[in-house]
Swiss-Prot record:
Keywords: Chromatin regulator, Nucleus, Repeat, Repressor, Transcription, Transcription regulation, WD repeat. InterPro entries: G-protein_beta_WD-40_rep, Histone-bd_RBBP4-like_N, WD40/YVTN_repeat-like_dom_sf, WD40_repeat_CS, WD40_repeat_dom_sf, WD40_rpt, WD_repeat_RBAP46/RBAP48/MSI1. It holds the Pfam family WD40. WD repeats lie at residues 166-206, 215-255, 258-298, 302-342, 361-401. This is WD-40 repeat-containing protein MSI2. It comes from Arabidopsis thaliana. Belongs to the WD repeat RBAP46/RBAP48/MSI1 family. PROSITE patterns: WD_REPEATS_1, WD_REPEATS_2, WD_REPEATS_REGION.
Length: 415
């Protein structure tokens, strides 16, 4: 009975937090789309291609999102492609905000591709955006070219273009090389990292791993290619370790215990070759320099509970975001580390100065989020409450950051 009371109190707090957030949305966001999904999605990913113009209104563009279903065996699972309509940068101020025209379709599921098991993670190949790698609750990684599949599955079976084999258990880690077309990394609970070249010739639509890396002492939570060096990638494990691998030698270059608890995610900075970030179950996000991994450069600890994901902003070198079991998606600006709190801001109660924004629109744990490279400051996030949200914080919140970058650029050009 005591547990039931605690659960009811917890749900009451969730509803109260959501109500406060909803009341403040007109002041916090320049864009906010909230779309209920039939089933929760564990994954969300922007298709890395230029948005198409929206036929009915040139002030809007159509982006594509990759989603999945998590039905827990209650229904057929699908990999999904959705259209998301957002205002273009040329749109008049206010378009897309809280008072956006309700008749403009915001999110529409355009394609459902049948898969075996729920989609743990799905990511598009950067060099061929219609090619999607999907890790499910099975051992195989599926490869689908959604351009070749009908809007609705014509078959009652999962029919991927390729089945990638090499794992013994399911997992979440998945990363396409930004440099080598077709190179796909996967990390799973079997403590293995598999590397495939999907351009290799398969046998009956089945492709074996080109190489299998082993070195972690427990499940691998995430893998990620380095953004500047085509030969390096990193892996994060439930053993608290960060491992940097070199594909030229197929050996570990570094292995360091960076957290006392699980490392759930890692992200290499797309601008600075030495900097990476990790998200951990110890409730922190940590920044590291690859040249000195024995101690973090900086630790951010505003999350309450485990942190499951961290991603650098592809458009701003010092900005990154993180999400955790506290239902919050936090955006950080490292330019503000060490700044004094201003009285006009809500002071230290709002967290450290580098905490730029905290998105509170989900009522349950956030499963995945993604920055939109084509639309600066736009993020898509999905949660266990079946919600998909596409949002952009108000310009007044991040303007200082962009002004600082412009000044820095002017100084560089003049010198």
């Amino acid at each position: 009975m005591a547990d039931e009371g605690k659960e009811e109190t917890g749900m009451g707090q969730v509803e109260e937090d959501f109500s406060v957030w909803k009341k403040n949305t007109p002041f916090l966001y320049d864009l906010l789309i909230s779309h209920p999904l039939e089933w929760p999605s564990l994954t969300v990913h922007w298709v890395p291609s230029t948005p198409n113009p929206y036929v009915a209104d040139s002030y809007f563009g159509v982006h594509k999102l990759i989603l999945g279903t998590h039905t827990s065996g209650s229904a057929q699972d699908f990999l999904m492609v959705a259209d998301v309509v957002t205002p273009t940068p040329n749109a008049e101020p206010g378009i897309g905000g809280a008072n956006q025209d309700p008749f403009i379709p915001k999110v529409e599921i355009r394609q459902r591709i049948r898969v075996d098991g729920e989609v743990n993670r799905a990511r598009c190949m950067p060099q061929k955006p219609t090619l999607v790698g999907a890790k499910t609750s099975g051992c195989e990684v599926f490869l689908f070219d959604y351009a070749k599949h009908a809007a609705k599955s014509q078959t009652s079976e999962c029919d991927p273009d390729l089945r990638l084999v090499g794992h013994d258990k399911e997992g979440y880690g998945l990363s396409w090389s930004p440099f080598k077309e077709g190179y796909l990394l996967s990390g799973s609970q079997d403590q293995k990292i598999c590397l495939w070249d999907v351009s290799a010739t398969p046998q009956d639509k089945v492709l074996n791993a080109m190489f299998v890396y082993e070195g972690h002492e427990s499940a691998i939570a995430d893998v990620s290619w380095h953004m500047k060096n085509e030969n390096l990638f990193g892996s994060a494990g439930e053993d608290g370790r960060l491992v940097i691998w070199d594909t030229r030698t197929n050996q570990m270059q570094h292995q360091v215990k960076v957290h006392e608890r699980e490392v759930n995610y890692l992200s290499f900075n797309p601008f600075n070759e030495w900097v990476l970030a990790t998200a951990s179950s110890d409730s922190t996000v940590a920044l590291f320099d690859l040249r000195k991994l024995n101690a973090p450069l900086h630790v951010m600890s505003s999350h309450e509970g485990e942190v499951f994901q961290v991603e650098w902003d592809p458009n701003h070198e010092t900005v990154l975001a993180s999400s955790g079991e506290d239902r919050r998606l936090m955006v950080w600006d490292l330019n503000r580390v060490g700044e004094e709190q201003l009285e006009i801001e809500l002071d230290a109660e709002d967290g450290p100065p580098e905490l730029l924004f905290s998105h509170g629109g989900h009522k349950a744990k956030i499963s995945d989020f993604a920055w939109n490279k084509n639309e600066p400051w736009v993020i898509a996030s999905v949660a266990e409450d079946n919600s998909l949200q596409v949002w952009q914080m108000a310009e007044s919140i991040y303007r200082d950051e962009e002004d600082a970058e412009d000044i820095k650029e002017d100084i560089t050009q003049q010198s």
